[in-house]
Regions:
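Active-site-proximal mixed secondary-structure blocks
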Residues: 1-47, 52-190
């Protein structure tokens, strides 16, 4: 009876799989590529939908919050450098296919970025500060935020890359659980 109702109403039963929010879910979420710097200085791209406005008014700055696994390349690179870019990509099929590929965990930056289809270029911060290193931005993106992690909030300034994270955890910034991290990042707008 349930199957008949689903077919009658036009719905289909989908199997939930890893990265369900990118592969099986259809609520409107942006697809972003978070650019960070690997230990070797290469730009690493990781696919994320869990990136939201945080400070939008009433402050001297604006900020986004990124939710991710604390074992991801993205989290480790932000913990080390405090820098990231949020690259909003368009809905072209080839870009979504690349986002799925780049979102798969477990590869080194060198392995993952070897066949990347996006053109990476220097952003405004790199051009304005040539003596400092920043993650490159995606030329094909329709919008890019260049960000700096606000380490000082919630006492996260002492968070470092580790193999395992034990309590206590922070409430909203830095390492927030055994497997999770949230990064409150200042958007550089000029």
């Amino acid at each position: 009876m349930k199957k008949e109702l689903e077919e009658l109403n036009g719905f289909k039963d989908l199997r939930i799989v890893d990265n369900f929010y990118q592969t099986s879910s259809f609520f409107p979420m942006p697809t972003t590529e978070i650019g960070t710097l690997s230990e070797s200085g290469l730009t690493n791209l990781g696919s994320y939908s869990l990136c939201f406005p945080y400070y939008i008014a009433g402050k001297d700055y604006y900020a986004m919050i990124l939710c991710c696994r604390n074992s991801s390349n993205t989290a480790k690179n932000i913990l080390r450098t405090g820098k990231c870019t949020i690259n909003f990509i368009t809905d072209k099929r080839k870009y979504f296919k690349e986002a799925v590929r780049l979102g798969y965990p477990g590869e080194t930056t060198e392995e993952k970025m070897k066949d990347c289809i996006f053109n990476l270029v220097d952003g405004k911060r790199a051009r304005e500060n040539p003596n400092e290193q920043y993650p490159k931005i995606i030329q094909e993106a329709f919008q890019v935020f260049e960000c700096t992690w606000v380490r000082e909030l919630d006492g996260a300034e002492n968070d470092k890359v580790q193999d395992e994270y034990l309590p206590p955890y922070h409430q909203f910034n830095g390492i927030t659980s055994q497997f999770g991290a949230h990064f409150l990042s200042l958007i550089h707008i000029s």
